[in-house]
């Protein structure tokens, strides 16, 4: 049986950290060129800022992306329970959710929270709801809600 893993677009449209790390790769350069367009010259400080943000964003995004993919590919399915849900307004009609859940792995209780973008699965979650999680035995303190990351775009 082949394990299903979320696509690149599913990850950046669901996971708050992955999306922000991905934006960080390009944001410095966008700011740098927009400033040059309006000011008429290039600002050395913004060049340094962009040159620093790009590799940091690349490394952080690659780490988060690999963490999610490897958890889906090599992790084990475990039951978990949603313990808290916090809603954060990020714009007129957009919301992010901070979802807290707990689960048992190898006889030990773990709690994890994950900030995710507004998706239909996240909106439908309720406190106390049972969910299927994926956790890797090497990093048992991190688990992801399976259905949320595999939800169609």
PLM region descriptions:
Residues 105-119:
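Disulfide-stabilized netrin-like
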Residues 73-89:
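Structural detector for short beta-strands of small beta-barrel domains
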Residues 76-78, 97, 131:
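Hydrophobic core residues within well-ordered beta-strands of beta-rich domains
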């Amino acid at each position: 049986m082949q394990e299903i893993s979320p696509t690149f677009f599913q990850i950046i449209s669901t996971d708050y950290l992955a999306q922000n790390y991905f934006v960080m790769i390009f944001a410095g350069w966008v700011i740098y060129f927009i400033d040059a367009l309006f000011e008429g010259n290039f600002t050395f400080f913004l060049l340094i800022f962009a040159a620093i943000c790009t590799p940091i964003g690349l490394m952080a995004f690659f780490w988060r992306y690999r963490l999610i993919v490897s958890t889906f590919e090599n992790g084990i399915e475990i039951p978990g329970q949603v313990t808290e849900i916090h809603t954060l307004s990020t714009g007129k009609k957009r919301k992010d959710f901070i979802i807290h859940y707990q689960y048992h792995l190898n006889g030990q209780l773990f709690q994890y929270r994950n900030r995710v973008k507004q998706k239909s699965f996240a909106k439908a979650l309720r406190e106390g709801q049972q969910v299927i999680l994926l956790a890797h035995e090497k990093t048992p303190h991190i688990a992801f809600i399976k259905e949320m990351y595999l939800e169609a775009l």
